[in-house]
């Protein structure tokens, strides 16, 4: 297993009951700046992304009773949901991690340049770690989320 940095921290995902309420705190108290909002009823979530001095926070709210966000909130309450790393050649890195015995879940390809998976919290001391590449810039966010 390599000990070189896996990639750049892209964003911190936080599960919340209400993105509107959480947004008030992040903007009003911390001074964050709204980037965009996205809703995915099929996957059962709404998210907003906020910038705070170059760090992106992704706030996730459940939509519907079978939402992964709702299940998370019921089990753990509001708080850290995941860390996302932008990893060059993520498909190859994910294969390498699996080869090294790291338990991965939720592997999927959005396009040839956009591939992701999650390191299981059981393998990473309780933290869900998302590894991917091709994450959207603000200008591409709306187009990317249509995939």
Predicted regions and their residues:
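Vicinal oxygen chelate
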Residues: 2-5, 16-24, 48-51, 58, 63-64, 75-147
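Regulatory and interaction patches adjacent to catalytic/ligand-binding sites
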Residues: 72
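Short, structured motif recognition centered on aromatic/hydrophobic residues
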Residues: 9-16, 23-26, 50, 57-60, ...
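Short connector loops at helix/strand junctions that flank enzyme active sites
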Residues: 45, 52-54, 75-80
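N-terminal beta-strand motif that seeds the catalytic metal site of vicinal oxygen chelate
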Residues: 1-21, 78-87, 136-147
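Long, hydrophobic N-terminal alpha-helical segment
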Residues: 2-45, 52, 67
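Short, charged/polar surface micro-motifs in flexible loops or helix N-caps
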Residues: 53-57, 64-66, 90
């Amino acid at each position: 297993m390599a000990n070189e940095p896996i990639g750049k921290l892209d964003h911190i995902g936080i599960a919340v009951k209400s993105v509107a309420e959480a947004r008030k705190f992040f903007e009003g108290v911390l001074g964050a700046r709204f980037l965009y909002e996205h809703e995915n009823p099929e996957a059962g979530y709404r998210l907003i992304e906020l910038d705070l001095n170059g760090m992106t926070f992704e706030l996730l709210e459940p939509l519907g009773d079978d939402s992964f966000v709702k299940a998370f909130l019921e089990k753990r309450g509001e708080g850290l949901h995941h860390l996302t790393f932008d990893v060059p050649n993520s498909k190859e890195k994910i294969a390498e991690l699996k080869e090294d015995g790291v338990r991965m879940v939720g592997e999927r390809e959005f396009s040839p340049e956009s591939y992701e998976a999650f390191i299981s919290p059981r393998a990473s001391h309780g933290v869900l770690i998302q590894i991917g590449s091709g994450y959207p810039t603000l200008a591409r966010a709306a187009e990317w989320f249509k995939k």
